[in-house]
Amino acid sequence: MILQSPIIHHVDLLLVGGTLRAVATAWKLKQQGFRVFCITPFSYFGEDLCSTLDLFAPKGREYRELFGTGDSLLPMKIKHTLDRKFIDAGIDYLFQTHPVQIVYDRNGIPAGMLVANRSGFQIIAAKVILDATDRSLVLRLAGAPFLPFQPGVYPVDLNVIGEVACRPDLWIHPCEGTVADGGKEYPVVRVTKEIEFRENSPAALARAAVAIRRAVWHPDTVEIADRCRNFAKSAARDRPQRAA
């Protein structure tokens, strides 16, 4: 299939994914005069904290630089602050936009990315593409070699606000803080469940996510994270090579 898509931006750096470290990198490069554009499949930045409800994780240097504090913030504050950082810096971005294919120049050098969203397909021409996706999607699209996946039993973590089911196959780790809503304080816990993986395909990861979400549910559960954290992922080799 041949797609004729418009080139909507020419930039020095295209950021794919909106994790905290990636946002900090893009923001710093913009301050140095580079042209930066960002896309994320989510409807906000800070997806590594907000979509996982990882609110009480240790705060690193990027967190303190972006938010000016080491205190734990609620998702709405995180999203709003990162939005304002990009808007005030003049960084253009698109939410709910997915990487589709690497675009190459006549010499076979990566020159941008074909992306998709509700408006259709567009091309963003870029000298450098920074992959900040959960499963290294850009590297995979570029044909980078990955280490073979080793089937087996892997832990899957899911953060939950409120009560969780008491089951022998669940390990519950209370977080340091609580979340207040409507005058009530709710505990935040990280639940771990071991799940067997025969493969690490998107379908297998989705089945694991459904399994742990069903396992943790309790009538007094307040909120369950949109994403779980699983360790059944293959890593890229140390020196990925672009496919010919």
Say what each PLM segment does.
Residues 14, 42, 133:
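Anionic group-transfer/hydrolysis microenvironments
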Residues 2-10, 24, 28-108, 140, ...:
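Conserved N-terminal/central alpha/beta ligand/cofactor-binding core
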